Every structure is written in structure tokens, then in C-alpha cells.
């Protein structure tokens, strides 16, 4: 049952974008087309999942050696290495997706949602073991993907909508994001 709480919580209740407001830059930047949003989401799922395992192990070493104060730097280095790996793979096997993601792919390195999940996984108050940390990482990525793909779908529909000129573009995107955020807060009562 604890695993189910982690999964539901990571996707809906504690969604990094819509509940904790982390990862807003790629959320607003890559969510113009569903293809790009899905590609970015899959990359983030991979990075969050693998980073959760590696940073969990790295944190155990940092605690053992008594150097917990370099946790954030160590986690950023792990995330940066994983993002480079993802970038190489996407560039090789899907050049179209690589070009569509553009500058936002390297920005996964500085995506605070990825760092946030790594830090949450090792926070003692959560008490996650390695499996729970991995599940939280993967399903936080799924929540990120859900939010960014939903936003991309909304933005694709908004392009063809009759919107007052002062709301076109970024303003209507923020309005749509705020409504999505309010909808996701309704899941808070589930757990």
C-alpha cells in the first residue's frame, strides 16, 4: 500500500510542476507541441528514475564519510552526467526530437524538479528506501510528463481559439497552467 501512495502522490498530489512549482521553465518552453512535450517527458522520466537510484547511493556514501554538506553539488554532477547520456542517445537515434527539444534538453541538468526529487528521496522525514526512492523518481517523472503533455495539448487547442489579443501567447498559457494547478490540488484529498 505504501508503494501505491508514493505512485499516486508523485503523479497527482505532489506533482512537481503543478503542486510544487518546480520545473516551470521546460513546462512553459517545451509545451508548445505534444510530440516535443512527450519526448521531453520521457527524457525526464529516465533521468529522474536513474538519478534517484544513483543519488540515493551517493548520499549513503556522503553520510558515511560525513560530508553531507556537498550533497547538492554531488547530485547536480550526477544529474548532469545523466543528461549528457540522454542527449547523446536522443541525438543519435532521434535527430528530429533532438532538434525539437533544442536548448531545453540540456536544461534538464538545471531542472529544479529533477534535483528536487533527488533531495526528497534522501530526506529523512520521508524515510524512503531505495525501491521507494526509485518509484518516487519514476512516477514524479510520469507526473511531470502528464503535466507537460496536457499543457501542450491545451496550447495546441488555444492556437485555434478566439482569444482576446491581450491574452494571446504567454498570458493565456499562464491562465491555463493556473487552472490545471487548481485541478491537481483536488487530488490532495485522495491521500
Go through the PLM ranges and name each one.
Residues 60-104:
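Ordered, amphipathic secondary-structure segments that act as subunit-interaction surfaces
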Residues 21-36, 83-97, 151-162:
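C-terminal ends of transmembrane helices
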Residues 6, 13, 44, 49-53, ...:
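Hydrophobic core segments of alpha-helical transmembrane domains in multi-pass membrane transport
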Residues 3-18, 66-81, 134-147:
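Structural signature of hydrophobic alpha-helical transmembrane segments
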Residues 156-174:
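Interfacial loop-to-transmembrane junctions
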Residues 21-29, 87-93, 104-107, 112-127:
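Generic transmembrane alpha-helix signature in multi-pass membrane proteins
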Residues 35-46, 70-75, 97-109, 166-172:
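Cytoplasmic-side transmembrane-helix entry/capping segments in multi-pass membrane proteins
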Residues 1-4, 57-70, 119-134, 188-191:
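Helix-coil boundary and interhelical linker segments in multi-pass alpha-helical membrane proteins
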Amino acid at each position: 500500500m505504501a508503494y501505491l501512495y508514493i505512485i499516486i502522490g508523485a503523479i497527482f498530489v505532489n506533482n512537481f510542476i503543478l503542486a510544487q512549482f518546480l520545473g516551470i521553465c521546460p513546462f512553459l518552453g517545451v509545451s508548445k507541441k505534444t510530440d516535443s512535450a512527450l519526448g521531453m517527458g520521457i527524457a525526464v522520466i529516465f533521468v529522474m528514475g536513474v538519478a534517484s537510484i544513483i543519488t540515493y547511493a551517493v548520499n549513503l556514501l556522503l553520510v558515511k564519510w560525513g560530508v553531507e554538506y556537498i550533497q547538492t553539488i554531488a547530485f547536480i554532477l550526477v544529474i548532469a552526467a545523466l543528461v549528457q547520456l540522454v542527449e547523446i542517445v536522443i541525438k543519435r537515434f532521434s535527430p528530429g526530437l533532438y532538434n525539437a527539444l533544442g536548448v531545453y534538453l540540456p536544461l534538464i541538468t538545471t531542472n529544479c524538479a529533477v534535483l528536487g526529487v533527488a533531495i526528497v528521496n534522501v530526506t529523512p522525514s520521508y524515510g524512503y528506501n531505495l525501491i521507494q526512492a526509485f518509484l518516487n523518481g519514476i512516477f514524479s517523472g510520469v507526473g511531470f510528463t502528464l503535466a507537460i503533455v496536457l499543457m501542450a495539448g491545451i496550447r495546441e487547442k488555444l492556437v485555434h481559439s478566439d482569444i482576446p489579443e491581450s491574452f494571446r501567447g504567454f498570458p493565456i498559457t499562464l491562465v491555463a497552467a493556473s487552472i490545471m494547478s487548481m485541478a491537481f490540488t483536488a487530488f490532495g484529498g485522495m491521500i
